[in-house]
């Protein structure tokens, strides 16, 4: 029986790191990427203390089409298939619309939206050919509820939800399931304020890995995940 193979983007810290941890605990191999080589190396050292043979990583700019294609091609060459893709890589710039630079807008869209498109497009043919696979796009409740100063971030997450829904319709007939996770406030370095009420990265990771337990006939195409007590 073949190993369960997963790819996680933005996997060196925060939600992505929690997803990598959770997938490794389930068994199988995990390939993750992040933009910073230093961040990748640090996470890989820590993870290999417990999982020396089952986790692999590269520094990849998901907004670079050629880097994404090379990364996925290498995984497919090594493993022959990909069972699960988690598109988690993301950045944020927050400023009033008239103070948001074009450069910041483009960089954010390149990472948050283009990167997810490139990754899905790269894994889809192999998943379709195999007749199964799971793609999870980590969006945000900010993709449904705009916030002041969040023009670029909101737009990227609205776009990611739309992209995810369309990909779901494209791929479901071939046994490939596409789901969007919409977390509320999560306690990560990305978050601007602390708070015990916030979701933890492990909460999001548990939701994502839980999708692997659904029968093939069931497709949770969107999941909204909120803190219980307050906030979004």
Model-based region annotation:
Residues 120, 156:
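Active-site helix of classical SDR
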Residues 173-176, 180-181, 195-232:
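C-terminal helical subdomain
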């Amino acid at each position: 029986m073949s190993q369960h193979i997963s790819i996680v983007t933005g996997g060196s810290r925060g939600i992505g790191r929690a997803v990598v941890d959770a997938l490794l605990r389930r068994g199988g191999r995990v390939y993750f990427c992040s933009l910073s080589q230093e961040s990748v190396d640090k996470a890989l050292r820590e993870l290999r203390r417990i999982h020396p043979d089952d986790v692999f990583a590269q520094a990849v700019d998901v907004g670079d089409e050629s880097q994404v294609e090379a990364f996925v091609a290498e995984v497919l060459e090594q493993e022959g298939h990909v069972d699960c893709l988690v598109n988690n890589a993301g950045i944020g710039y927050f400023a009033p619309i008239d103070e948001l630079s074009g450069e910041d807008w483009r960089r954010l869209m390149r990472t948050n939206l283009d990167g997810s498109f490139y990754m899905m497009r790269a894994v889809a043919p192999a998943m379709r050919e195999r007749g199964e696979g799971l793609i999870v796009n980590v969006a945000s409740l900010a993709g449904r509820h705009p916030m002041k100063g969040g023009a670029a971030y909101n737009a990227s997450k609205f776009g990611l939800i739309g992209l995810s829904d369309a990909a779901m319709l494209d791929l479901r007939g071939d046994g490939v399931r596409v789901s969007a996770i919409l977390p509320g406030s999560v306690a990560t370095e990305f978050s601007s304020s602390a708070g015990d009420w916030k979701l933890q990265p492990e909460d999001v990771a548990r939701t994502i890995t839980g999708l692997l337990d659904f029968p093939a006939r069931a497709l949770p195409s969107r999941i909204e995940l909120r803190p219980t007590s307050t906030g979004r």
